[in-house]
């Protein structure tokens, strides 16, 4: 896995980073605050996770297509909960690649990351969805959120987990 800065002047603002996986698949990292749609700017973190998970599985939809699909087929409160995002990924992708868990131990999350899976994680206070991926060459765990990338640990992220009954959870995308 490599993470490179986007050099394209047309879409650099909306997608500042690109993740290139070992199988040469490219996942742009969206910055939700630079989209026209008011819903994406305010509550788009779960849609960013939805978009990145579909790209991880090899399905190319843009953010607007993800939003229109979610509006037509998924249930929404203030934002889309991870249960609905998981259901949406499984509707689009063949083989049911996404699995939802209410909570998970650090060891189990670490094991999934070592296998090369993508993790969508709901943080609390404020409620926010982030994407976790592991670089197998360096062993670092990367956290993607709001068009930014940070190195983190599973323990740090698990301490920040959401406790709200409706929104809490973890989605593993294989």
List the predicted regions and their residue ranges:
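Active-site-adjacent structural segments surrounding the nucleophilic cysteine of cysteine proteases
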Residues: 1-75
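Conserved active-site-adjacent core of cysteine acyl-enzyme catalytic domains
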Residues: 54-174
